A protein has these predicted regions:
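Copper-binding active sites and cupredoxin-like electron-transfer domains
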Residues: 2-10, 17, 24-25, 29-557
């Protein structure tokens, strides 16, 4: 770590982090995630040192993989911020390949000479014969200043980790890890993933100006792995004392000659006391800033998931550190599809039909907390609808003069409104249509429900509160800023947007007038891990925003 005082008072650190959270949230209203990376068959990488920025103001000396000078990668998906692949980043570049293709990864060791050899380990991938490099304990290595080339045929689809296979207790801790995503071959994509409901969901996105940022229509070669949106999260922790000692020893051995006495590092990696807990190389709130944000030149990837009701959201998760992290997704369970590219199928000989495509049924568990095991990757589907709320999430009101408040809900065979993909209540749970939640609402929503909301003057709104119990800016504006005929405490006629109990101020991360989504915290269930250097909030924490269709999820950030 750079020469900074690690012994700041808790009070000073708390004030600093609180200020950082506030400033970051002001700029994260439209910062989303997707699963950005570089795609191709040839990747020229380097391992090099740099500093990682942390929310408490620290810059931590680290090592990471990056793109070699002169290598021009193909960035996917196309984002409004130009993709950046510096010579060092944490996590390393997400390598995106297609099943069955021949892949070549060349690694040049630009670490300090005293750091010794380095390498890349691709667990579960069969490598071809080596023509360069130095044999190591687990894989072929690159000596300081030298190069090693890894060749393999891209295996079955799915998400996998890659990381250093050399002195892993130090090199992985220092940041030498990344993700390998294998996409299904185009001919292997199940037909139902490009037709039927999959097509309707794309129509729903297009009707509101959204673009398809998926890497593929399916996660695996299986008809029950279709998805509508995707995110990649790599979990790791960092003990700054190890990094500080590594930097000090590198400085002390600067200019040494490979193989000479004393030209090596002897950094203790135990006892282990991490202070930073990272999602995609960043701690909260930094993880909610955009991908490729210039303030994080060596931490390009964010963690800021969004979705619409009814979408199948693929989450790709990798445990990259030394510890196991219980990743808790509020809002619903995650259906595990596979681990390390191995689809979990039923042992039964029976088959099911998925929109006319027969296949062996999946057997992955449903988990409300998905454990991220060191070195292990999994793919899972997160799904959310308003079913089970027991009130109309869109605040429909049959007596309203607003046409969006009187939309119809025609149930399909599963009870959802899927007939018109252009409607803002596409995928509404029709059983709760027009069902009120508030007993005596002020605004233009149905009344005579079971709930009296607390007085807005008696509590403070959280940064992610959408402004009302309803989904979307139309419903929230009606609920908080309108008086209409038939409401128990208002005059006759319709007066919308003139007065109201709110929309509330202060909800800067989920503005009531433009987004008004339902926010679900996604975080480590080891509560210490949602801190930054022991200060809450921070660490492994992000928010999943479920947004109404009227809100455009613009993942070009």
């Amino acid at each position: 770590m750079r020469a900074t005082n690690m012994k700041k008072t808790i009070f000073q650190a708390h004030l600093l982090l609180a200020a950082m959270v506030a400033v970051t949230l002001l700029s994260t209203v439209s910062a989303f995630a997707a699963a950005p990376g570089i795609k191709g068959t040839t990747f020229n990488l380097v391992a090099a040192p740099a500093y990682l920025n942390q929310p408490d103001g620290q810059a931590v000396y680290s090592w990471g993989y990056g793109c070699a000078t002169g290598f021009t990668p193909t960035f996917v998906p196309t984002l409004s911020r130009a993709g950046v692949c510096n010579v060092m980043q944490v996590p390393g570049p997400t390598l995106i390949v297609t099943e069955g293709t021949q892949v070549t990864v060349t690694l040049t060791n630009n670490l300090p000479i005293s750091a010794g050899n380095t390498s890349i380990l691709f667990p579960g991938v069969t490598l071809g014969a080596f023509t360069d490099g130095t044999p190591g304990l687990l894989t072929q290595e690159a000596a300081p200043g030298a190069t090693v080339t890894y060749r393999f045929t891209a295996p079955s689809p799915g998400t996998r980790a890659y990381y250093s296979g050399t002195q892993g207790d130090l090199q992985v801790e220092m940041g030498l890890y990344g993700a390998l995503i294998v996409l299904p071959a185009p001919a292997s994509v199940p037909s139902n993933c490009t037709s039927g409901m999959a097509t309707k969901n794309l129509q729903a996105e297009g009707a509101h100006g959204e673009v398809d940022y998926r890497l593929a229509p399916a996660a695996y070669d299986h008809p029950d792995t279709c998805y509508d949106r995707e995110y990649l999260f790599q979990f790791a922790e960092m003990d700054p004392r190890i990094h500080t000692q590594a930097e000090a020893q590198v400085t002390a051995t600067a200019g040494c000659v490979t193989g000479a006495a004393g030209c090596s590092l002897n950094v203790p990696t135990e006892p282990y006391h991490p202070a930073y807990f990272l999602i995609n190389g960043r701690s909260m709130p930094d993880d909610m800033d955009p991908n490729y944000a210039t303030e994080y030149p060596h931490q390009p990837y964010n963690g800021d998931p969004h979705m619409h009701p009814g979408e199948l959201t693929l989450i790709r998760v990798i445990g990259q550190g030394r510890w196991q992290h219980p990743f808790h997704e509020h809002g619903n369970h995650v259906r595990i599809l596979g681990r390390d590219g191995n689809l979990i199928l039923s042992s039964s000989a029976s088959t099911l039909s998925y929109e006319g495509v027969p296949a062996t049924p999946l057997a992955g568990p449903l988990q409300f907390t998905t454990t991220t095991t060191p070195g292990l990757a999994f793919d899972g589907i997160f799904y959310w609808t308003a079913k089970g709320l027991n009130w109309d999430a869109y605040g429909h009101n049959p007596t309203s003069a607003d046409p969006l408040a009187t939309l119809t809900c025609t149930p399909d065979a599963n009870g959802y409104n899927t007939g018109d993909p252009t409607a803002i209540n596409y995928y509404e749970w029709c059983q709760d249509h027009f069902k009120p939640v508030q007993k005596a609402p002020f605004g233009d929503v149905a009344g005579n429900g079971p709930v009296t909301l607390p007085d807005a003057n008696l509590f403070t709104n959280g940064a992610w509160y959408g402004g009302s119990p309803y989904l979307g800016p139309n419903a929230t504006t009606r609920a908080t800023g309108c008086i209409t005929t038939g409401q128990p405490n208002g005059p006759s006629g319709s007066q919308c947007g003139q007065t109201g109990s709110t929309p509330p101020s202060g909800t800067i991360a989920n503005p009531p007038g433009s987004e008004a989504g339902f926010a679900f915290m996604w975080h480590s269930h080891n509560e210490r891990e949602i801190t930054t250097n022991n200060i809450f909030p921070g660490g492994m924490l992000m928010m999943m925003l479920v947004d109404s269709r009227e809100y455009v999820i613009d993942e070009t950030n």
